[in-house]
Amino acid sequence: MALTKAEMVERLFDEVGLNKREAKEFVDAFFDLLRDALEQGKEIKLSGFGNFELRCKNQRPGRNPKTGEEIPISARTVVTFRSGQKLKERVDAYVGSRQ
């Protein structure tokens, strides 16, 4: 199950006490801020959570799975996320408690 923006808005409404309009504006502004920073080539560091950064990937050979024909996969820039140590520890603790 995925956490959606709508669910984030609901949680802000329930747990923080923002009204739904304010909560939606907050969530939208947060993602706009992240998007703008990445568009400017900035790294995003969220303490206790992780880092978002841009990575350049070189062109490489690929293959059309239907025909087997070799095709080039063009160079591109991708967004990567590296989880922080605190997030890793919390996820590990949660996963460990479910086994």
Curated annotation (Swiss-Prot):
Pfam families: Bac_DNA_binding. It comes from Xylella fastidiosa (strain Temecula1 / ATCC 700964). GO terms for cellular component: cytosol. Coiled coil: none annotated. One of its GO terms (molecular function) is structural constituent of chromatin. The keyword Nucleotide-binding does not apply. GO terms for biological process: DNA recombination; positive regulation of metabolic process; regulation of DNA-templated transcription; regulation of translation. InterPro entries: Hist_DNA-bd, Histone-like_DNA-bd_CS, IHF-like_DNA-bd_dom_sf, IHF_alpha. This is Integration host factor subunit alpha. Keywords: DNA recombination, DNA-binding, Transcription, Transcription regulation, Translation regulation. It comes from the Bacteria. Heterodimer of an alpha and a beta chain. Belongs to the bacterial histone-like protein family. This protein is one of the two subunits of integration host factor, a specific DNA-binding protein that functions in genetic recombination as well as in transcriptional and translational control. CDD domains: IHF_A.
